[in-house]
Amino acid sequence: MAINGNASFTMKDIARELGVSVATVSRALKDSPRISTEQKERIKKFAREHNFYPNLTAEQLRHNRVKPSNIIGVIIPQIAHYYFSTILSGIEEQARIRGYSIMVAQSEERYDLEKRICEHFMENRVCGVIVSQAKDTVEYDHFKKLAVMGVPLVFYDRICTGINASRVVVDDYMGAFTAVTHLIETGCRRIAFYGAPMKLEISKNRYNGYRDSILRHGLELDESLVFICDNRADAEELTPKVLSRDDRPDAFFAINDDTAIGILYTAKRMGFKVPDDVSICGFTNGERAVACDPMLTTVEQRGHMVGEEAVDVLVAHVERLLAPGKIEKKVVRTRLVVRGTTR
């Protein structure tokens, strides 16, 4: 028994195409030591290319080893990242309440690893997948395979616009709009934006909030103050150049706290007083926001709530509480937390 995009495709088809026995195919897909590594990889590769995955749960049921899957697959870009760890906490807690377990894998922001994780989830017959895509993911066939095989998908934080799937996001646009409005209302006029690559929906939305706040308040939108910079190391490298300009900014809005803290320490090292000479606002409200001096003004994302909502949406799909094909979009509100890096 297997799950695949073509219901007529079987182990017999694989055996015929590769010139081996059905028993050899079966052993290879079960990772039997009786088959050479080279032969196993050849058979597994062919099976993957044809969307054929052995139904391990069904095999185990025949031997009365497990109950049907109630396992949710979770793909997280970086477990060590504060925001993602709070989302994971919300997912785990809500899954437990709803009677599900989770299988967690870290993509490390790598497309190739993300693909392998999806294959692993399919082989283990998870009942659904909650995922935030890796930064370098630009092709989505691995997600489409899940959808074709009837595995519900829910995206969080970084959503995949190439797939019609449910998603849970924070209100990135309004969070950015509110943050930049705060900077303007406290006297800032030249506000730099440090963002992620614009292929990511969150970066587009936060940039749009930044831009619209500036224009709404009658200020000039200076695109020379818009940079792709989304981590502390890059911020510490870029900021000296930005603050050395004759027309330097008097404020920074950063796409995350890590980047904002890189700006903060660089500005202080250069002799600027924060917030008197330059104001800084981040986006996360993680533990580091209160560990720096001065403490960071930032936008709170409420990751735990994002995780809870993602589980609820996925379970609604798994338990058929939503009509087939219905797409849910949940938006979690942000909150501006004003501290010492703004006036």
Language model regions located:
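Short acidic capping loops at alpha-helix termini that bridge into adjacent secondary structure
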Residues: R190, L221-L225, V274-S279
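Short acidic/polar active-site loop segments enriched in Thr and Asp
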Residues: S21, C127, R189-R190, D250
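N-terminal helix-turn-helix DNA-binding module of bacterial transcription factors
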Residues: M1-P68, R343
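Flexible loop/turn connectors
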Residues: L238-R343
